[in-house]
Amino acid sequence: MDLNFSATSVSRARWSSAYASDPTVWEQLFETKWSVVSNILERKLSDPEHKVVYDELMSLLENMTNMCTLLMLEANSQPEPIIGPILDKFFTEQILERVLDWSIQLTDSLKSICQLAIIRIFEMIVSDSHSQNHCLLVHKPILNPLFRLCEWFQRADIYWRVSKSENKKTSEAEKMFVLLLNQICTKLVEDRTLLHFFFHSNQFVVFTELIPFLYSAGDTGQLARDAVLLILSVSAEDKSIAEYVTERTSFCQVLTTGLSACFSQLPRIILGDGGERLVEDEYRDFLADYHSALLFCNAIAQTAHSEVVGNIASFFYTGFLTNVIKPAFLQNDREYIGASMVYLQMCLETIVEPVLVRSIVQMILTERDDNGTLFYEIVISYVKGGDKTSVTSLSLIDSFLKLACEDVMLALVFRPLLTNHSATKKQLSVVYKASRGGELSQTYLNCIPICMLEYREAASHALLSSYMYSTRIRMDARSEQCRSWKWKYDGVVAGSFVLPAESDDDATFNVSFSRMSSSRSSTSMTPYVSNRYSNGSHLSHVFNINKVCPLGQPQEQNADLSLSELDDDLEEDKDFILPSIDMEDVSEEMTASKVMTQSTIDYMHISGLDGSESDDALPIRIEDSERSETDSEAPKSNFVLSGWRDVKDMGTFKQLLSKQEVKGEKLDSSEIVDFINQKYDSLKLGEEKKEDIEEEESENETKGKEIKSRIVTDGFSIYNFPERSKLLQTILEGVETLCENELPFNTELFSLIADLATYPQPLLAYYLFDPKEDSSEKHLLTILQGVQTRIDVMAEGIESFEIWIERGFETLKARACRIKQQSTASSPRTSDDHDPTLFYGRSTMAPPGRKPLLREPSRQETLDDQTARRTALAAILLAHLCQMLASIVLQQSLII
């Protein structure tokens, strides 16, 4: 059934340029149309039992559409916002109100048709309004019927969903209604004054009606989300609208509930090897919906009012992360766990707004399972196994590291290192030596398998240069990300409680003077100030202040300083430090007057004592007094310094004043009164401003406490951590079994190492790269040397090993091409198209797409062939890894 009526269908024969520019003809035609509509309305009004037939309905709708077309012609032709004859007719006759009253009385079979037509009429009024200064929606005869239509549509929509629950597709009326609301929101952006007409303290119909359609399929849901985003961006500074959204609507709950619903529709199994993530065609739209929902949440957090954002973050944490994501990681199905890791990684890579990222970090660091295991420890535990889930867990951990969040890195890496590593300050200082970079990088280059040295694709100066170029860019970016961290994690600045000292002479010569200058003010105060990690317990009760070098001085000068003396210093710092005065001897009165300089100047101005009008004015003479407490002259003083304590009557006061010789005229009493009043008003205004500022700070503090009350914190002390880093231990174990691992696992593992090694913290750099004296503990360098020896020995025993190397190059190239093709649609690469590095710039999550044909190893592959294939791939990867680590070590000499 075609309901696209047009005004030209009636008057096409008379349409001309003269007709289009003649308002008189418009009025005549409008009266003709209105007479038809009026008769139909009166017929039902005079006879309530009259049953409207289909032809009668079509006649009314066609004429109403033509009338609205003429109305828009009149409104757009006027240069000023005036009420023309046609618009006046709409007002006086209340045309839209009467049509709505008539429509409600129709039978159910005709009511839906009429409702759709009325929606299109209002859509015409909104979309065809091209006048910049006259929007018809500001008039109540137009606006009130629109509100009634929204309420009527809501009731009818509920009826349709109940009576036709089997039809899950969006109806045509729903699509047109959402389109109408979207166009209204667009008008609100163009003219923000319209917000006053649509929002009241107890209702915001346009916003409320959009909520049920936020997650509708297709264009309808997208239009609804765009409209909501427009409203929240326009009202971002309006606190009343923010309170309405959070307190009187279910928007925040629906937002996170819809995200959870999108997650529940995702497939429980991800195809591919873990590095290549693929889905079946039937789940392609569901994955796209999940991605759109994440983008929408992030966009809302970027544009909405802070109160709305805080509410969304709360529901995002409780309704989605802890109730949906966390249980998915605690299942017994490793396939589903691996898929859930991919979806969480997709969430991490899509959401960039800090308030939502903070919620994700909170879940990672604080949530536990029934056994008390932390969430990130659960993820690390899934690395073992070497299957597809292990690959996805490595990729997810890599996403954790990419956040460059100090809290995440403290929990995963630095907290165990601070309490369990055995390096002393003297040993750790090796990372600052200039010769370290060249010597250590050569050591890592020596770990390249001998069998790979003849292949320029895997070991060459050009490839090393490419790694050095990429490493410089990545480490500079990482250093910038870590610039705002609270600690440097260098094992020196934090004090002697972090690193055991071999002797009292352990040098701290690598700490810059500026840091040593600030160590007194920052470190000495820590016993009295709480710390966000250890709740004030990061310094033990036996903390030795002697280890702190004050202002760059040697430790011996401060060896006798005790905590009691430190308390005295702290008490002294609380006092006001008097400014230096260029006088040999200054009385107590002068000292007090110097502290209150401004008050003295004001008094001198009143008494005329600063009335000198020339630069050569003689200084005020200071005469001795009988009870003077000092006989010293003060050449730079311009006031009597003694005798004021003895002033007990007006005579003595005048006698002291008479001793002053003043050049210049004294002020009149009226001028003095004006000056005093001016000073009083200034002080009073300052107090009022101070009270306003204190009141505002109190409100902000109250809000801050409310927000903090929503956040579950789990602070910990660095002392209570007996275990070594599970992440670092897992990484070293993975490198040690390089020849037994499959290609996807090794590539994800080395990509994780690449991101971890780019952190510029000296403590981590020493642990990862430098050789250790303790041979009982495994270290990366010794492990690489062992793997190199093993690969070279195995290569000598494999027949035609060079053929397997060539096949390995082909396998890596084909895999890189597949991953690139999958990721080109969402993030096409530009400068890295010909990047020969293997572990930099890879896409971790391909966009939704069809399942391509995968080339998998033949099931008839013999055990010897499998060993040869893995050994060849391990040799290629190890050659790349050694060159990457060597380039990182060289760059560390410039960064650390």
From Swiss-Prot:
* Origin superkingdom: Eukaryota
InterPro entries, from UniProt?
FHIP, FHIP_C
Identify its protein family: Belongs to the FHIP family.
Q: Where is this region: Disordered?
A: 823-865
Q: What name does this protein carry?
A: FHIP family protein C05D11.8
Comp. bias regions, Basic and acidic residues: 853-865
Q: Which Pfam families match?
A: DUF5917, RAI16-like
